[in-house]
Design a protein with these regions (language model features):
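Bacterial Sec-dependent N-terminal signal peptides
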Residues: 1-22
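N-terminal active-site segment of His-dependent metallophosphoesterases
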Residues: 19-88
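Extended active-site neighborhood of metal-dependent phosphoesterases/phosphodiesterases
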Residues: 30, 77-199, 215-221, 225-237, ...
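Residue-level marker for buried hydrophobic side chains located in beta-strands
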Residues: 36-38, 69-71, 109, 202, ...
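Active-site flanking residues adjacent to catalytic metal/cofactor-binding acidic residues
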Residues: 40-41, 73-74, 158, 204, ...
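Short acidic, glycine-rich surface-loop motifs adjacent to enzyme active sites
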Residues: 195-211
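Residue-level signal for glycine
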Residues: 304-306
Length: 314
């Protein structure tokens, strides 16, 4: 029996090695932690590194028993989807993220600006057809238990295009101006205020702070509308996408850590600005591990390398 057990154990370790071999710096996360990945700016029919990064995500999810994936907007470039039967679903999502480890966990989704070129309602309705796709509303919150402890983590998923005047004034984002952004801001505020959870994490598509060539009004609108709430209500992190590179920022005088997840396909150059702790232009995804005492995140690029690791202590 002992010999049989050793054979089984050796086989299990060998399979784990194979699953992690493309990850240049694989790190085994605590099994008792809440472990998840962040993906954003994804769907390009597998090109621009998307298919390769999807493979890496599958290996990471299998290697570390990931609990879920948070999608920080723009899952379907360039024009979102027109309906739940749009062929874009298969071409840019279903046929790309095919690893078993990615099929059997929930994907919690928020829309980005590209979804507003199509039907945001279809993004929500697809939740009724897909076992893994979770978009119950334009903005929503979930609680996740940290391992088997009584400690919980609050995730607040928000809808950022309506918070930015640039999109509200552009007819090509016709659904944005119809949204009551002040109602959403009141909801974000009350959700954070009423939470006694150990960690409070807000996830949206557009950054509050970031280096980018995109219009500065995007960040100033986010700072005056969302940033104040995040700081006043003591959110621990704000995680976003949109800029297509990795950034970690904590401007002077701010208590929130601002994380920009890179694109899971096509990336862009980046420079350091005031408040930058780290930046990297490569495409990839973010791996996160939450315990009672620490929130640790890893930026993993398209080569499978961990280009940055940072821990926030409670």
């Amino acid at each position: 029996m002992k010999k049989l057990f050793n054979i089984f154990l050796s086989f299990f370790l060998f399979v784990s090695f194979l699953n992690a071999q493309d990850l240049v710096t694989p790190e085994k996360l605590p099994a008792k932690a809440l472990n998840f990945m962040v993906a954003s700016d994804m769907g390009r029919r597998g090109v621009s590194e998307q298919a390769h990064i999807a493979t890496l995500m599958g290996k990471e999810a299998d290697f570390n028993m990931i609990d879920f994936i948070a999608v920080a907007g723009d899952p379907i470039h360039d024009n979102g989807v027109k309906s739940t039967s749009d062929s874009e679903w298969k071409d840019k999502y279903e046929n790309i993220y095919t690893a078993t480890s990615l099929m059997n966990i929930p994907w919690y989704v928020v829309s980005g600006n590209h979804e507003y070129h199509g039907s945001v309602q279809a993004i929500l309705d697809y939740s009724k057809l897909s076992v893994r796709w979770k978009a119950p509303a334009r903005y929503y919150s979930i609680e996740k238990r940290i391992g088997k402890t009584r400690n919980k983590c609050l995730f607040v998923f928000i809808d950022t295009p309506p918070l930015i005047d640039k999109y509200r004034a552009d007819n090509s984002y016709s659904d944005a101006f119809k949204q009551d952004f002040e109602k959403q801001l009141r909801w974000i505020d009350s959700t954070l205020v009423s939470s006694n959870d150990r960690w409070k994490i807000v996830i949206g598509h557009h950054p509050v702070y970031a280096d980018t060539e995109k219009a500065i009004t995007e960040r100033t609108d986010m700072q005056k509308r969302l940033g104040t709430i995040l700081e006043n209500r003591k959110a621990d992190l704000y995680i976003c996408g949109h800029i297509h590179n990795f950034q970690h920022l904590k401007p002077e005088g701010k208590t929130v850590n601002y994380i920009v997840n890179s694109s899971a396909s096509e990336s862009r150059k980046v420079n350091r600005i005031e408040g930058t702790l780290f930046c990297n232009p490569n495409p990839g995804f973010t791996l996160c591990s939450v315990t009672k005492a620490y929130f640790t995140f890893f930026f993993i690029d398209h080569t499978g390398s961990t280009v940055y690791k940072y821990s926030i202590k409670k």
